Amino acid sequence: MAALVAAAALAAAEPPPAVPAAAGSGGPTSRRDFYWLRSFLAGSIAGCCAKTTVAPLDRVKVLLQAHNHHYKHLGVLSPLRAVPQKEGYLGLYKGNGAMMIRIFPYGAIQFMAFEHYKTFITTKLGVSGHVHRLMAGSMAGKMSMTAVICTYPLDVVRVRLAFQVKGEHTYSGIIHAFKTIYAKEGGFLGFYRGLMPTILGMAPYASVSFFTFGTLKSVGLSYAPTLLGRPSSDNPNVLVLKTHINLLCGGVARAIAQTISYPFDVTRRRMQLGAVLPEFEKCLTMRETMKYVYGHHGIRRGLYRGLSLNYIRCIPSQAVAF
């Protein structure tokens, strides 16, 4: 889902035009390569900062979604105080290391997809300028599934580490988690538990978030163009949302989309935890997991457990990324 944000950023980016190189310089190709390397690193670092900022909320959400027995009796925000008391403040960042590692290959796949599609659109379809950047960004967004599949094992490891509580560690670190899951849970297949609800949850999330953001933008610029809009830097005759309004609309769109797709997120997390949970044998498939969660915990405290944390994290994560 973060890939949708990455695709939008890619679509908005445009490398500087190639200029004749002076004698002894690296030439236009090397300059363009450096530009994309710089953009990739900047995007990855921004992603790391954004994820680290909301890491405590992510860790608490995992504990609540899977009803960790140490914290299941607490409300949504109480674990933010209980975790530091029991595990120290670093306990709020368990699993964040695996997330940081995941961001770089995830971003690399997005950038490679964008470049591949941009070249294809330019050479095969003859489209250039803003149109081909938007088309390439859209197609790169569709490649998010590839990025998810390639980096999914790191997400599984991240969730396993985040669910552990001090004094009851099953895994001593990232490498040990990889080795243990591979050895005890069916080899590579053990790293892809929960992939189906992940993929199924991406479709409603993407469609609802884009539709909601587009609607908010259209309505806002139609009824309050002076208050909410500003002239585009590319074309002064075109109005775009002001930065803080764009941020707010993006946060609202994400919150609505996450509400609709959240049961898939709960299902994914519980399946990713696999043998760590005592009900593992009863939740081998997506259908079994959803049925178990609904039957034992209902809708509010089961399929939507921890949703309010998603609302809280929408704005700060977007703000830091910007």
Swiss-Prot record:
Organism: Rattus norvegicus (Rat)
GO MF annotations, alphabetized: coenzyme A transmembrane transporter activity
Underlying gene: Slc25a16
Function of the molecule: May be involved in the transport of coenzyme A in the mitochondrial matrix. Very little is known about the physiological function of this carrier.
Family (UniProt): Belongs to the mitochondrial carrier (TC 2.A.29) family.
Protein's name according to its UniProt entry: Solute carrier family 25 member 16
Keyword Transport among UniProt keywords: yes
GO biological process, one term: mitochondrial coenzyme A transmembrane transport
Subcellular localization: Mitochondrion inner membrane
Membrane topology: Multi-pass membrane protein
Keyword RNA-binding annotated: no
Renumbered ranges of Solcar repeats: 34-120, 128-219, 241-322
One Pfam family it belongs to: Mito_carr
Domain of life where this protein originates: Eukaryota
Main location: mitochondrion
GO cellular component, as recorded: mitochondrial inner membrane
Alphabetical UniProt keywords: Membrane, Mitochondrion, Mitochondrion inner membrane, Repeat, Transmembrane, Transport
PROSITE patterns assigned: SOLCAR
